């Protein structure tokens, strides 16, 4: 962290601007495409101030200047010659799936970086730097923002950390249950990512600000729904049934970051939280995801991005910006030069499409609106002469625009056979990207017959499964114990309530281990059809993960005095456990054990015992 003895102003961090400006001046001497400037902006300009941004909040004038430098470089402007900024900066800084380019805005990035220091302050309680700050500035609980009100005696470093805590961290703090002594039952975020008061039926408990989770937990029975029911909805109660307190190991309640799937704080998730667009807009995520997946060079993708944002400088767009007196096409003189006219309907481009698009598809191809036309063709992975149609389509659009610009500005763009040229260029591009890009290259698959296999002599196999109708939604789990002959040793179904699919899977594992331990089985082979859950059980999970309380309970059984082997299997080998999980939806809430085979499961048990298999294509 910087040690500053004077008041911060724009001169304090002037060196950052000098470094960025000097780097840009060297690049401007080189001929760079828009895609090249974008790469440098994201990789270098956005990363140069990161160290300073991670330790202190920079003055707003510095942040504005950093954004200005990035903007002017990205669009190719210089002091001598200004260029049109085709898309507004806020759009450029939005995520790619929302139609942006993923460039980081300086102010939001600064706050996201400094908030990471604030998160560490809450997590690293015994670190020396944490102890010093806690003692000097009387750090309190994150729930109480009174200690975060700025004071004149604060240092610039602590003032920055406090702003990160107040404006970022406090909005994303959640809790993972342990012993329930710290979680405020009604006001903390620990179920569904929201306080229970925001999910209740409108009434407010009198002591809601002081009641902790342990106060409403009955050891050996679960939640005290007699006290909870009057203030909660049915959905909330179903979600509570999927959560338990750990009073056995004595694990404490832990902080979790609600804006990431694993509960761990990241600068990326904090930045996304700060820049989320809450204004209702059409969902264009599928369109732009499709656009960025096309196998073409980055310069073609960035042109497609301009097309998707309707920011290409056609005569219609130039006329709208008062840069041209007419919006008529300068090539055919036959109509308004709109985006669709340039890319498809102008005779200069139409001749190429007629020769490339099969006759049977031409009616639909030439009748669609701009976005429908782009989406259907950029997402078309069908082959055309061994090349995906999406690649050929994008290449034709790109070269059509280049040829058009060359014609208007008098450049020599002669090509004897343009259709042959674009096809050959598409083949070259596709082969280059197929050789260098791992994304999309799938491993070969072969068909194999998959079925349940009995355990070795002396072992009992436990198959478990979980199901969620909605993820999160109504959830259940099931499991079965069988010996080396395939005989039924016991089974269970669990109607959980409401939770996610991974949580349901873990409940199945927990009760499978519990069931086997109660039956005093010395050697267990646990089979689960979720690779994620197998990974949690074998390698562990961070304490901030939303499912860590369940993983800890499962590890409690794994550490007992017995042998447990954990194996991942395909669902075709786990059909009986899946059947018991789905059977639980027809039962009342809670755990149901079966010493005898339920009638609905007898056929599945018989098929497994007889060695029935089903085909599945698996990776080599």
Swiss-Prot record:
Documented EC number(s): 3.1.26.4
InterPro entries: RNase_H-like_dom_plant, RNaseH-like_sf, RNaseH_domain, RNaseH_sf, RVT-Znf
Single GO MF annotation: metal ion binding
Top-tier EC class: hydrolase
Positions with a binding annotation for Mg(2+): 465, 505, 529, 578
Superkingdom of the organism of origin: Eukaryota
Keyword line: Endonuclease, Hydrolase, Magnesium, Metal-binding, Nuclease
Ranges of residues in domain RNase H type-1: 456-586
Keyword match Hydrolase: yes
Cofactors required: Mg(2+)
Binding note for cofactor: Binds 1 Mg(2+) ion per subunit.
Catalytic function, reaction form: Endonucleolytic cleavage to 5'-phosphomonoester
Record's protein name: Putative ribonuclease H protein At1g65750
The species this protein was found in: Arabidopsis thaliana
